[in-house]
Amino acid sequence: MEKMSYTFSQQYEEKIRPCIDTIDNLRSLGVEKDLALPAIAVIGDQSSGKSSVLEALSGVPLPRGSGIVTRCPLELKMIRSKEDEKWHGRISYQNHEEDFDDPAEVEKKIREAQDEMAGAGVGISEELISLQITSANVPDLTLIDLPGIARVAVKGQPENIGDQIKRLIRMFITKQETINLVVVPCNVDIATTEALQMAQAEDPEGERTLGILTKPDLVDKGTEGTVVDIVHNEVIHLTKGYMIVRCRGQKEIMDQVTLNEATETESAFFKDHPHFRKLYEEGFATIPKLAEKLTIELVHHIQRSLPRLEDQIQTKLAETQKELEAYGDGPPSDPAERLSFFIDKVTAFTCDTLNLTTGEEVKSASKLLIFPELRQEFAYWNSFLDSSGYSFKLKIEEEVDNYEVKYRGRELPGFINYKTFEGLVREQMKLLEEPALKMLKNVSDMVKKKFIQLAQSSFTGFPILLKIAKTKIEAIKQDKECLAESMLRTQFKMELIVYTQDGTYSQSLLRSKEKREEDEEDTENFDCMTVGIATSNHATLSEMKLHLESYYMIASQRLADQIPMVIRYLLLQEAALELQRSMLQLLQDKDGVDDMLKEDFDIGQKRENLLSRQKRLMKAQNLLATY
C-alpha cells in the first residue's frame, strides 16, 4: 500500500501514539467492563461502504460478502511503525491470542474468530474481537467496527436480527465517550439512512458524530451540488462535520485492484472532478485526509476524557473496596486459620448485636439502626395514652345524665363512692392492655428483622451459618416475646389495684384542680357549678371527674415508662445477651466448623469478580499515573 501522506509534525506524532496506547492498554486490561472508554465506533447501513473505508484505512482486506459480514464488534487497532519494520498482526478474543505476519490472513482470522464467538452461520455476538495491525502504512488510530444495520432477515437469521444489531450498536453509541463515525453512501437520501438516524437519536446536537460519505462515483448527474452542500455541513448539521472518500467498488475488487492502486485512483478522482475538486482542495476528501481527521479527533477526545476517567476509576475503586468489605475475605484453607476466622466471624456478630441494642456503632452494617424505630413505637404509645385519657374524660362527661342509674349506690348526694371510682379506673386500664400487647408484637417483629439483617450482613456467603443464626434469633424472639407478654399482662393486673403514694396523688390532684379553675374562669356557669357542692349531683360528678383525671395522669405516666422498659429490657437487652451466649456456644463445636463455613458458590464467584475488577482498576490507575 502506498504510504499515506501525513501532515503531522514529528512532535505531534510523538504525542499521538502514547495517547492512543493509553486507552488501548486500558481496553486490553478489561477496564471497559467497568467504565466507558474514549473510542470511535463505525456504523452504517448494509452496503454503505463501511468495510471498504476500514480496508482503505488499515490497508488489509476485511471480510466481505452479502448479508451481515461483521458479526462481532471488531476493535481495529492500527499502530504506525517505522519504515524499515515489517508488517505485523495480532488477533485476540476470549482467551485466544495469535500473532501472524501475512496481511492476506486477516480476513480468514476474523472469520474464524467470528465463528468461534457467534457460531458458524449468520448470528451475532456482543463479545469484542481485537485486531492489532502494526505497519508503516497505517495511521495511529483505533476504531471499533460494528455490524451493518440489516432491515430484513435472510435465511438462517432470527426474525429480530435487525433489533439485535441495533441493540448492539446502541451499547456503543449511547456512551458519551464514543465518537460515532457514520458511513453513508452519496447515492442515497442522507436523511433516510438508519445509521444517521440512530446517531442523531443518541447525539441530537451532533457533537459526537462525524459523517463519512462514500461512493461519490455513483452519484446521479445533477445531484453533485447536494453532496457538496452535505460535506459543507449545510444540510444536516454535525458539529464534527463530514468527510468524503472513494474506495474500491465491487468490480475493482473482482478485477483485483490493489489498495495501493485504489488510493491513487481516489486521489485522481477528486482532483479531476469538476464538483468535488473543491472538497479535495479544502481537505474534506480522500482516505489519508480522513485518517488525519480521525486521529486528531480521537486524540483530542482522549485528552478531554482522561481527567474524568481518572475520577471515575477512583470512584469505582472505592465502590469495589466497599463491596469487597461486605463480602469479606472468604474462609482460609488452613484448619487453624479457618478456626480463627470462624471465631472472629461469630465474635464480631455477637459484638455487633450488643452494639445494635445499645445504640452503638455496628461495624458490619453501619446504616443498621434500631432506636429510631423503637423511639417511634414508644412515642406512639405515649401519644395513645394521652388520647385515651382524653377519651376517658369525654366518656365521663357524656354519662352525667346516666350517673344516678349507673354508678350511684345507697350514698346520699354529694358523697363520692370509692368503689365507683375504682370501677371506672379498672375499666379504663383494661382498655389499655391490648394496645400495649400490640406494641410488644410490633417491637418484637422489628427487633427480629434487625437481628436477621445483621446476621445477613455478618454471614454473607455462609448459608449454613446464616441459617443457624436465623433459627436462634427466631427461638429467642418467641421466648422473650412470651416472657414480655406475661410481664405486661401481670403489669395490667396490678394496674387494677388502684394505688399510688399519697404525696404523689395529692400533687396530681392539686394540679388538676388548678387547671380546672383556670379553664372555668371564663365559663358563665362557673358559679352554679361550684356553689352547693354538697347537695349537687353535678358537683359530685365534677369532683369524681377531677379525681379520675388526677389518677389517670399518674397511671398513664407509669405505663408510659414501664411498658417500654419491660419491652426494651427483654426484647433488646436480654435477647441480645441470649443470642450472644447461644452463638458463642458454636465455638465449642470445632468439628462442625468446616460445615458452617461452607461458602455460597455465587458469593465466592462474586468476590473473585470483585478482586479481578479491583486488580484491573488499580493497574488502570497506575497506567494513567504514568501517562
UniProtKB/Swiss-Prot annotation:
InterPro entries: Dynamin (IPR022812), Dynamin_GTPase (IPR001401), Dynamin_GTPase_CS (IPR019762), Dynamin_N (IPR045063), Dynamin_stalk (IPR000375), G_DYNAMIN_dom (IPR030381), GED (IPR003130), GED_dom (IPR020850)
Domain Dynamin-type G: 34-307
Induction behaviour: By interferons.
GO cellular component: a single term: plasma membrane
An example Gene Ontology biological process: synaptic vesicle budding from presynaptic endocytic zone membrane
Binding site for GTP: 44-51, 145-149, 214-217
Cell compartment(s), UniProt: Cytoplasm
Primary location recorded for the protein, binned into one broad class: cytoplasm
DNA damage listed as a keyword: no
Keyword Hydrolase on entry: no
Region (G1 motif): 44-51
Annotated spans, G3 motif: 145-148
Region (G4 motif) residue spans: 214-217
UniProt keyword annotations, A-Z: Cytoplasm, GTP-binding, Nucleotide-binding
Region G2 motif: start-end pairs: 69-71
Region entry G5 motif, spans: 246-249
GO molecular function, one term: GTPase activity
Residues of the GED domain: 541-627
Record-stated family: Belongs to the TRAFAC class dynamin-like GTPase superfamily. Dynamin/Fzo/YdjA family.
PANTHER family the UniProt entry points to: DYNAMIN (PTHR11566), INTERFERON-INDUCED GTP-BINDING PROTEIN MX-RELATED (PTHR11566:SF225)
Protein name (record): Interferon-induced GTP-binding protein MxB
Classification lineage: Eukaryota, Metazoa, Chordata, Craniata, Vertebrata
Encoding gene, per UniProt annotation: mxb
